[in-house]
């Protein structure tokens, strides 16, 4: 059973094949008109792509990928619940926020220290889920500064952790190439 905050930060390796990750990156890179550049003075700074919007638009490039991604996150949410014996304490009804790809393209792209629940609109979030789609040459860690913990981005690695204020984190700059991240949040219904 978990006894400290770090225990609730869970990493699984090889949750998807490299080909699956490469396919998502290729689809992302082939649809530049639907990219959204976010630049709030590195809080955050990256390029974002909303997979769920493309799915809802019935884009054939994303239909099966969205379903596969959803099944992946459902499966690992169940593992998270089981590992920490959260059954009776875990929300009985929840949903996933839209699935998004984030590309940290250059050494200036990053997401400085933040928490994922900031206001009324984000207060439904309770668990963060990331899948790293590539392994940058250097850097790109998800850093938890108050917990003295860095999670290295590795192709096919999943990271889950609570979304609240105790889990302040940052997306460190990737050096020598981009970092691609697939992410979502679990939300209360």
What does each model-found stretch correspond to?
Residues 1-158, 166-189:
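Fe(II)/2-oxoglutarate oxygenase catalytic core
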């Amino acid at each position: 059973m978990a006894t400290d905050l770090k225990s609730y930060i869970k990493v699984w390796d090889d949750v998807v094949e490299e080909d699956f990750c490469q396919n998502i990156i290729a689809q992302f890179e082939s649809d530049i008109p639907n990219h959204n550049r976010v630049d709030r003075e590195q809080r955050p700074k990256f390029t974002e792509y909303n997979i769920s919007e493309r799915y809802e638009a019935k884009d054939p490039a994303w239909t099966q990928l969205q379903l596969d991604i959803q099944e992946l996150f459902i499966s690992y949410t169940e593992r998270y619940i089981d590992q920490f014996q959260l059954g009776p304490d875990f929300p009985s009804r929840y949903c996933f926020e839209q699935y998004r790809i984030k590309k940290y393209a250059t050494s200036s792209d990053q997401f400085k220290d933040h928490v994922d629940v900031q206001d009324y609109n984000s207060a439904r979030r309770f668990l963060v889920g990331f899948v790293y789609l590539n392994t940058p040459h250097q850097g790109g860690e998800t850093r938890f500064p108050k917990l003295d913990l860095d999670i290295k981005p590795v192709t096919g690695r999943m990271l889950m952790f609570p979304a609240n204020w105790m889990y302040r984190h940052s997306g460190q700059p990737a050096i020598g190439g981009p970092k691609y991240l697939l992410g979502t949040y679990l939300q209360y219904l």
